[in-house]
């Protein structure tokens, strides 16, 4: 059984409609009333039900109240900002840190122009793009781990 209704091309009435260029309007399920009046509201109602159900069954836990006179020794950003936080923390000049962060997207923009190959080619046969990805991934992981250690061990991660 199929979800898609296939037209019967042996039907002479359908062949006449197709010859006039109007067959696509006369078979299958119409999109206008069904999608906009049934599928979309049902999806929104399901999403709203999930959100309300989760907020009722698993409310957020409140932490301890903030104390303005007792600040932590080191304030860390969210985990996805760890690499940029460590880059700004390790580089001696803040302008150099900002330029290093701006160089990342600029360097990624140049990769397709440097490696001029077919876009449908196997990614394992694109050595520059693969090496750029691997180098960037491991650098981001290294900088992210380094943000969690003290600044004197941020570069070496305590290995040397």
From Swiss-Prot:
Transmembrane segments in this chain: where? Answer: 36-56, 95-115, 131-151
Against Gene3D superfamilies, the record matches this protein to:
plastocyanin oxidoreductase, Single helix bin
Major location (coarse): plastid
Localization per record: Plastid, Chloroplast thylakoid membrane
Q: Which GO terms describe its molecular function?
A: electron transporter, transferring electrons within cytochrome b6/f complex of photosystem II activity; electron transporter, transferring electrons within the cyclic electron transport pathway of photosynthesis activity; oxidoreductase activity
What cellular component GO annotations does this protein have?
Answer: chloroplast thylakoid membrane
Q: Which Pfam families match?
A: Cytochrom_B_C (PF00032)
**Assigned keywords, A-Z:** Chloroplast, Electron transport, Membrane, Photosynthesis, Plastid, Thylakoid, Transmembrane, Transmembrane helix, Transport
- What is the topology of this protein in the membrane according to its UniProt annotation? Multi-pass membrane protein
InterPro entries from the xrefs?
Cyt_b/b6_C, Cyt_b/b6_C_sf, Cyt_b6/f_cplx_suIV, Cytochrome_b_C_euk/bac
What GO terms in the biological process aspect are recorded for it? photosynthetic electron transport chain
Q: Specify the superkingdom.
A: Eukaryota
The record's section on PROSITE patterns has: CYTB_CTER
Quaternary structure and partners: The 4 large subunits of the cytochrome b6-f complex are cytochrome b6, subunit IV (17 kDa polypeptide, petD), cytochrome f and the Rieske protein, while the 4 small subunits are petG, petL, petM and petN. The complex functions as a dimer.
Role played: Component of the cytochrome b6-f complex, which mediates electron transfer between photosystem II (PSII) and photosystem I (PSI), cyclic electron flow around PSI, and state transitions.
Give the protein family.
Belongs to the cytochrome b family. PetD subfamily.
HAMAP family assigned: Cytb6_f_subIV (MF_01344)
Q: What is this protein called?
A: Cytochrome b6-f complex subunit 4
